Amino acid sequence: MKKHVMLVKPFSLEDEKDSENTPPNLIQRILSLFKNVRPGSDLTNFQLPPQMNLARSQLQCYGEIVYSFDGHDLLGECSRRDKPIERMKAMVTWYISTLRPLIFGLAPYNPVIGETHHVSNGHINVLAEQISHHPPVSALHATHEKENVDVLLCQYFTPKFRGAYVDVEVKGKRVVKLLNHKETYEMNQPKLLMTFLPAMGAHWAGKIVIKCPETGLGAELQLLSDSFLSRFTGNNKRAIKGKIFESSSRKQLYEISGHWDRTVTAKNTKTGQLEVIYKASENIAKLKTPIVENLQEVSESESAVVWGEVSEGIVTNNWEKAREAKRDVEEKQRESLRKRKASGQSWIPKHFSVARTGKDWDCVPLQPTVPRAPIVVPL
């Protein structure tokens, strides 16, 4: 039987104009879903109808922030810089590029356990795997063949209903290693907020911290969430402010400011020199849909295969097909769980070694590098 692979275009900057006007029926549907949910409730296992799903898995969303970009290869640039301070600036720039626009009222699929996503873009190879379903924990390993860069994510989120908004805290680790320089950059993930009142919207918020123990440099970035007033003034919408500093003395070296969906600058606090370090229009616009380069090598566990029928139903507005296909995916997962329980087997991830301490998860890739994928971003 031929594999059905359904790949969709990553959400680009220019696509936002199509999602700015939220239809009233979607708002009513969202509010009706939450009418029996108490504030403070954990929404981790909350079931959504296909009409409220993006045509992609959460694994694909994680993968896209690494392999989906237009223009300059910002990840490789982190390693190409000669001086430690320049590498930290490049790391800040790359991190900002991973912030992508969000669509209010729509969420990706919750990946099934064992689901994978494997895509390449030039010298960057990305492999993600769902290492747990309850709770939903995702692992991602990416390697840059040319610049010897290693990226590791082990993330899980806890969405909570707060009455006027949904607060999604992303936990876990995000580590980038510049192996040519023997440097490790540790960083966290901002919160995701979906607000209903006083104004509807979905945005990133909170504090981002980047640390490099080897160079003694650090960075802190504050994402200013959309406030009620900013809806009218436009001043704080997607604003980002922060600094690069020496960790030991807290001496500030650069002041970071701008808007992550537009332009971000870095000001040298000693010389006053200002430079543009990031332009969103040159990096997260005009993103290309990945293509299948080798169908035979596409895994049955690939996100685009697992959710292919569901995504096709959503894209074509065939909601009955999408509902049936989603039920099939979920029933297969339940059946797989029943079989494992009956045989006393526990799930073992294929690509990662996993450790769990209480509520904290950690993972290590089983292979030092990620091979080229059968799915690629076209040049």
Swiss-Prot record:
It holds the Pfam family Oxysterol_BP. InterPro entries: OSBP_sf, Oxysterol-bd, Oxysterol-bd_CS. Signal peptide: none annotated. GO terms for biological process: lipid transport. PROSITE patterns: OSBP (PS01013). It comes from the Eukaryota. One of its GO terms (molecular function) is lipid binding. Disulfide bonds: none annotated. Expressed in flowers. Keywords: Lipid transport, Lipid-binding, Transport. SUPFAM superfamilies: Oxysterol-binding protein-like. May be involved in the transport of sterols. Belongs to the OSBP family. This is Oxysterol-binding protein-related protein 4C. The lineage of its organism: Eukaryota, Viridiplantae, Streptophyta, Embryophyta, Tracheophyta.
